[in-house]
């Protein structure tokens, strides 16, 4: 039976009729006569540019993704009266500033669209989230509807922040990488703001933080020198994440009354005794450059602590709550010898990073059998790794940032790991033996190591650098091993 073209179109319409989402690319181009009749279609991603497709988008569409297509004429959007989500980012030559967008839009992404006139936004009375980052500086007075809850203005080089004071419903604000001199320190930000990112933006001081009593997350960057005593961080009761790594710790850290869950502290090689009072809600803690072994006493009070990371610091013993799951020591030292026996009590420990200048009693202690992941960045620990023998649940083994002139032998053939990773060990030579259980090898290393790639029967994936590409493609040409070049 011969079918007419109209019959074929009808069959295809019935085939696609109930689809809610379609992605159009070079390999999946839909007939425009079918597309415009898909009345149930809600979400459309167009990755392949075709003007006929744009002019036949169903008017009932709710979400449209047309990023980086070099579209010039966006007039077709005005017909989409039900659209709530619109992504037109990276269309640098479009006429977006000259059209009236549908009032229904709640999410608009026009990042990197070469915009300098933003008045078209004022019409969007239902707008909740707006991304206009990486565009040109313009006049923002009376541009943004007060409905906006999230606003991303990264890298626009804002000079006058006065417009933000009117956004009374604003909760999340990203003004990072605005390096031009501006008046932010004179602005009274809306109290509604809970998340503020001003990373690497120009600021004369932090006076603008005073009004942000509801802030939940904040990170101090290194654009200006600031002392902790200059900022009363204790008044931010709703804080959940705080990064003060770029603050000079010249006063006590008193935050026990907050809702803090994560904090990063840099002691800047100080040997001062600091009173640290953190809430029991804390789950993640990072301490850097602490040269005073007495500044860890507060850890025992943190009964919900799950993760601790200690970097370039002095520590002799770790006394924390027994429920801790992740412990990472990176480039750490001790005034005498770190007592590894203190790790035996952490029966829920999942991940352990061992970066110490000595191994003292590591091979004599009995590490928790709960450990599934080990990360090592000390050559002496690699050479004497008997402590691994009792880790029956170990699945992941990583060698990180080891530099040595000798050839290092690593025998893991009897340790039933599934994932092995070596990274940042430039100019170091290894002789590595892995078990048959190995499934993933990450070889982010610029030297060819002595490793028998062929014998691992369970191997599924290798991630490596370009220098190993030809060798591995040849070895695994007719196998199911996936090779990813990074």
Curated annotation (Swiss-Prot):
Keyword Flavoprotein: no
Lipid biosynthesis in keyword set: no
Entry keyword set: Leucine-rich repeat, Repeat
Residue ranges of LRR repeats: 18-39, 43-59, 60-81, 82-103, 104-125, 126-147, 148-168, 169-190, 198-219
Transmembrane segments: none
Name of the protein this chain belongs to: Uncharacterized leucine-rich repeat-containing protein AMV014/Q3
Organism for this UniProt entry: Amsacta moorei entomopoxvirus (AmEPV)
């Amino acid at each position: 039976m011969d079918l007419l073209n109209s019959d074929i179109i009808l069959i295809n319409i019935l085939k696609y009729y109930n689809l809610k989402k379609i992605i159009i690319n070079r390999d999946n181009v839909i007939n425009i006569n079918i597309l415009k009749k898909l009345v149930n279609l809600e979400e459309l991603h167009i990755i392949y540019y075709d003007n006929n497709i744009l002019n036949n988008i169903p008017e009932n569409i709710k979400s449209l993704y047309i990023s980086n297509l070099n579209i010039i004429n966006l007039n077709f959007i005005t017909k989409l009266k039900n659209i709530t989500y619109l992504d037109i980012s990276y269309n640098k030559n479009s006429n977006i500033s000259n059209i009236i967008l549908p009032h229904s839009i709640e999410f608009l992404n026009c990042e990197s669209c070469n915009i300098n006139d933003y008045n078209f936004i004022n019409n969007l009375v239902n707008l909740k989230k707006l991304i206009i980052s990486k565009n040109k500086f313009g006049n923002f007075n009376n541009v943004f509807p007060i409905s906006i809850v999230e606003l991303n203005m990264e890298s626009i080089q804002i000079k006058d922040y006065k417009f933000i004071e009117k956004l009374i419903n604003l909760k999340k604000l990203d003004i990072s990488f605005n390096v031009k001199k501006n008046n932010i320190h004179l602005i009274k930000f809306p109290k509604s703001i809970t998340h503020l990112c001003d990373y690497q933006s120009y600021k004369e001081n932090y006076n603008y933080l005073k009004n942000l009593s509801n802030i939940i997350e904040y990170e101090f960057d290194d654009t200006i020198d600031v002392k902790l005593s200059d900022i009363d961080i204790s008044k931010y009761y709703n804080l959940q994440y705080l990064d003060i790594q770029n603050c000079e710790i010249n006063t006590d850290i008193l935050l026990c009354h907050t809702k803090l869950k994560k904090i990063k502290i840099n002691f800047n090689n100080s040997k001062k005794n600091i009173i640290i009072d953190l809430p029991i809600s804390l789950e993640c803690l990072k301490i850097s450059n602490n040269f005073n072994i007495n500044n860890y006493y507060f850890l025992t009070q943190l009964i919900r602590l799950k993760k601790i990371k200690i970097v370039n610091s002095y520590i002799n013993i770790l006394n924390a709550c027994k429920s801790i799951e992740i412990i990472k020591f990176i480039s750490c030292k001790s005034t005498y010898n770190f007592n590894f026996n203190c790790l035996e009590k952490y029966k829920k420990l999942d991940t352990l990073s061992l970066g110490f200048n000595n191994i003292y009693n590591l091979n004599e202690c009995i590490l928790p059998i709960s450990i599934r992941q080990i990360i090592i960045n000390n050559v002496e620990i690699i050479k004497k790794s008997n402590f691994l023998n009792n880790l029956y649940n170990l699945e992941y083994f990583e060698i990180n940032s080891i530099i040595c002139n000798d050839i290092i032998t690593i025998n893991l053939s009897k340790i039933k790991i599934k994932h092995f990773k070596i990274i940042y060990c430039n100019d170091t030579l290894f002789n590595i033996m892995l078990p048959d259980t190995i499934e993933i090898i990450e070889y982010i290393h610029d030297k060819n190591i002595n490793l028998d790639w062929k014998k691992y029967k369970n191997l599924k994936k290798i991630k490596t650098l370009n220098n190993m590409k030809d060798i591995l493609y040849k070895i695994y040409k007719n196998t199911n091993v996936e090779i990813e070049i990074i």
